[in-house]
A protein has these predicted regions:
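PDZ domains, with a preference for the canonical peptide-binding region formed by the helix
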Residues: 2-38, 116, 189-190, 195
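PDZ-domain C-terminal substructure recognizer with occasional recognition of PDZ-binding tails
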Residues: 7, 21-63, 139
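Active-site donor-binding loop signature of nucleotide-sugar glycosyltransferases
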Residues: 11, 54, 76
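A short acidic/small-residue loop/turn micro-motif
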Residues: 13-14, 55, 226-227
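C-terminal "post-core" interaction segments
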Residues: 62-248
Length: 248
């Protein structure tokens, strides 16, 4: 594409790192440290080296904006350790701007942390069960929401790449009757894994718990079936009207 490209990190070619994660790890470090980036400039077709000083920054996992008809559009990229705070702020900002309805976009969302999922749903749902976990021995953990809830029409966009926590976000809102689910049937990942480092440097992930929706439904192999089927692979297709059942 017509962009500048990072070609090396501290003198080591990008291709030699072997993976994206290893390249990112080479860039990261303590704030104030310096990293040398090799850049191929598209406009000049020249290779240059830039010295970049590391600084602390907050990853943005939630973005929002107002669409036509006062639809508050909120995109959740994934459920990370700061997603819940960003989500709560986005919901409040859309309400402040006068949103008449909310549209949550979880297409291609890979899931993430259980705590972030629970806190995001707690912002929206009334008092009740959010999600439960059960281990091999049958021990169950339940997560609940408080009485505070958002009283606006809602819809959730999902697709065939909405995964894990993203699926349970949609399922909870669907079961509570709080949102219309629009899009494609989701993956159907309903369990959690724990990683164990191996002596050869590898990692073994073992499934440890099964997740269940507020009504006790497992999504394993089934996923979430949308209320309204739609091809949502094109990210530009995000202008959906959010209607109450009586208006649909």
């Amino acid at each position: 594409g017509c962009y500048d490209k990072i070609t090396a990190i501290n003198g080591k070619r990008i291709d030699d790192f072997g993976s994206y994660d290893k390249a990112v790890a080479a860039v990261r470090g303590k704030a104030g440290g310096v990293v040398q980036l090799g850049i191929h400039q598209y406009a000049t077709n020249q290779d240059v080296t830039l010295s970049v000083t590391r600084a602390e920054y907050e990853q943005i996992h939630v973005t929002s904006r107002m669409l036509d008809n006062q639809i508050g559009y909120i995109r959740i990229e994934k459920f990370a350790d700061n997603t819940d705070e960003q989500f709560d702020a986005a919901v409040k900002e859309m309400q402040k701007q006068g949103a008449a309805s909310l549209l949550f976009d979880l297409r291609n969302n890979p899931g993430g942390q259980l705590t972030a999922l629970v806190n995001c749903l707690d912002t929206l749902l009334p008092e009740g069960k959010i999600i439960s976990l059960k281990d091999k021995a049958g021990k169950t953990e339940k997560y609940t929401s408080d009485a505070n809830a958002v009283d606006l029409p809602m819809a959730v966009l999902v697709n065939a790449d909405s995964y894990s926590a993203a699926e349970f976000f949609a399922a909870a809102l669907q079961e509570y009757g709080k949102a219309t689910i629009v899009g494609e049937k989701t993956v159907g990942k309903g369990y959690s894994q724990q990683g164990f480092e191996l002596s050869n440097g590898g990692c073994l992930n073992i499934s440890t718990h099964c997740y269940y929706t507020p009504k006790g439904v497992s999504l394993i192999g089934k996923g979430v079936t949308p209320d309204k089927q739609a091809d949502l692979k094109n990210k530009k297709k995000e202008h959906f009207y959010v209607l109450r059942d009586s208006e649909d």
